[in-house]
Regions:
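Ubiquitin-like/PB1-type beta-grasp interaction modules and other compact soluble beta-rich domains
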Residues: 1-64
Length: 65
């Protein structure tokens, strides 16, 4: 399936947002996710299905000082 992750095209086999995070190597990382412009909390990632052509944003919190 073809999706966009952080404005880059990806061909993935994942069908859920949680599976996508694992497939892209983000498992265990503290990240925030959005699907098609809507925030998806960590508790809903496993049941959030990815449609073909989905727009996914994955961001890591930044620390500053």
């Amino acid at each position: 399936m073809q999706i966009m992750v952080n404005d880059e095209a990806h061909e993935v086999s994942a069908r859920t947002l949680a599976a996508l995070i694992d497939e892209l190597g983000y498992s265990g990382a503290r990240i925030a996710t959005a699907l098609n412009g809507r925030f998806v909390p960590v508790t809903q990632r496993a049941e959030t299905l990815l449609p073909d052509g989905a727009q996914v944003e994955i961001v890591a919190p930044m620390q500053g000082g």
